[in-house]
Regions:
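Short active-site loop/helix that positions an aromatic residue
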Residues: 105, 114-130
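N-terminal extension/subdomain marker
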Residues: 1-81, 99
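Short helix/loop capping segments that flank catalytic or ligand/cofactor-binding pockets
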Residues: 99-101, 118-120, 146
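Glycine- and acidic
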Residues: 96-106, 137, 151
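Long, internal scaffold/assembly segments composed of regular secondary structure
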Residues: 109-114, 140, 144
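Helix-hairpin-helix/helix-loop-helix acidic hairpins
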Residues: 81-97
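C-terminal catalytic or substrate-handling cores of phosphate/nucleotide-
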Residues: 65-76, 82, 132, 136-185
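Short, well-ordered loop/turn elements at secondary-structure boundaries
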Residues: 84-86, 103-106, 130-133
Length: 185
């Protein structure tokens, strides 16, 4: 169960992330943006702030050998497909400003993508010379009162962490063999 009081835990006061190309972003209204964020810049933030970077993430890092192994395998052996295979991260913040290839964040936390963030941090192959990019939603917290801001923050954290896990039977049911069999019927 998610506790309401956890939605406004302390955040990282200020930080910067790098995006792939100058001014390459999609705005959603005036309160959100989607960018392609540098994995190395996320790794640097985690090195500086550790789990404080994930203070409002409801699940931090879920230790799962298979998923961690798959993320690490893509980073190390198929980095060009990382953007395609990874759901990315979601950041909530009091404010953000995009200027060229830099996004400045104020009072922010990664609320979804803790596992990805942790695996980027652990990866020795991600550095200033070897970087990759991943999708990132940046959402400005709305509300006039602390209660409204808390409620909004919690709603984003809940919604972005509520996906159902894929079971092996789900994968098998959609395998090419099963699809051909169903079409033949």
């Amino acid at each position: 169960e998610i506790k309401e009081s956890e939605s406004r835990r302390p955040t990282v006061e200020t930080g910067k992330i790098r995006i792939d190309e100058a001014d390459n972003y999609l705005l959603y209204g005036d309160g959100a943006a989607i960018v392609n964020v540098s994995a190395y810049s996320i790794k640097q933030l985690y090195a500086q702030h550790n789990t404080n970077l994930l203070s409002r993430n409801l699940r931090y890092h879920i230790a799962g050998r298979d998923i961690d192994k798959a993320i690490a395998d893509t980073i190390n052996n198929d980095p060009d497909s990382f953007w395609l295979k990874n759901n990315g991260i979601t950041i909530i913040c009091d404010d953000f400003d995009i200027d060229g290839k830099e996004v400045r964040l104020r009072n922010f936390s990664i609320v979804n993508g803790g596992q990805t963030t942790y695996m980027l941090h652990k990866s020795p192959s991600i550095n200033s010379d070897h970087d990759l990019y991943l999708p990132c939603k940046i959402i400005r917290i709305v509300g006039d009162t602390e209660d409204e801001k808390s409620s909004f923050s919690l709603s984003i954290a809940k919604a972005t962490n509520s996906q159902k896990a894929i079971k092996p039977v789900d994968l098998k049911a959609n395998s090419p063999e099963q699809v051909r069999f169903a079409q033949a019927m």
